């Protein structure tokens, strides 16, 4: 194999190694828990991941710190809870 072919192979292997962890990321286990809707402090708008819908949904969060399935924004919820194929 020529040196150009070896460099191409090395480049492709490096790219594959970099992309593999991103494409196989799984969601956090807390994303499967139901939203905590108890009122303990000030009620704020938050988002939780709804597994049956496979998306993030807005809800009223009462500040009780019940579980990790509450996020300040839809974007943060999606980053933490959506699976990547």
From Swiss-Prot:
Subcellular location as annotated: Secreted
Signal peptide: 1-24
Disulfide bonds: 31-81, 40-64, 56-77
The keyword Nucleus appears for this protein: no
GO cellular component: extracellular space
Domain spans labelled BPTI/Kunitz inhibitor: 31-81
Pfam family, one: Kunitz_BPTI
Tissues expressed in: Expressed by the venom gland.
Protein role: Beta-bungarotoxin is a presynaptic neurotoxin of the venom. The B chain is homologous to venom basic protease inhibitors but has no protease inhibitor activity and is non-toxic.
Family: Belongs to the venom Kunitz-type family.
Protein name: Kunitz-type serine protease inhibitor homolog beta-bungarotoxin B2a chain
Organism: Bungarus candidus
